[in-house]
Amino acid sequence: LLTLGFDAMDAAAMLNELYVLRGDGCFSTIDLLEVDLCTGEGALYKWGAAPSYLKKGGTVKKIGTASPPPGLGVGEEHRAERVGLSLQRGEQLVLTTDGIPEAACEQYLRACGPLSPRELAAGVVACASESEPDDRTAVIVQLDPASMQPHHTTRRARFRHTSRAACGM
C-alpha cells in the first residue's frame, strides 16, 4: 500500500480492517519510520509494537505506548500511534521486537557508551534471555551526518519493521 502512494495512517487502517474481516485471530505488530534523510525530520508509526528508544550518549527516551495490535478491533483505540521525530546528529533510534525485555533493554541503552549501530544492535539482542522462545530483533537507525545538509530536493526513506505475532490467541 505504501509503494502505491497511500498515507501511512490510511495503510495501517486498511491493514487493520483486513485482519478484522479475516476473523482468524491473526495479528501483527507494526513499526514504520518515515524520515527525511537530509533534515532528520520524520514520523514513527507504532501499532502493537514493543517500545522504541531514542538514544544520544547516556540519555535514552522511550517512544510508544502499549496499544493493541492491528486485527483485534476497530475504532479510535485500535489505531496506529504517530510520533513526530527530529533525528539529530549522534542520535540512534532503536526499534526492537517484543522478544527483548523492555527493562533490560532500557538499562543496557543507558549504561553502554557510544557504539556503532551494528554493535548496539548486537548488545540489545543480547539483553534477551536465551531460554525464552521468542524472536529477538533490533534495528538501529542512525543518519550519516555527511548526508544531513540542507538541499532543495528532499530524500525520504521508509523503514518497515513488522513482526507477525501469534495466530489463534
Residue ranges and their predicted role:
Residues 15, 135-136:
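Catalytic palm active-site di-aspartate
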Residues 94-96, 137-142:
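Conserved active-site loop/cleft motifs that coordinate metal ions or position small ligands
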Residues 1-57, 64, 80:
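Catalytic core of PPM/PP2C metal-dependent serine/threonine phosphatase domains
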Residues 25-30, 62-105, 129-133:
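Acidic loop->beta-strand submotif enriched in PP2C/PPM serine/threonine phosphatases
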Residues 102-106, 147-150:
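Short active-site-adjacent structural elements
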Residues 4-11, 111-119:
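Short, charged, surface-exposed loops that flank catalytic or proteolytic processing sites
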Residues 115-134:
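A short, conserved beta-to-alpha structural element at the edge of catalytic cores
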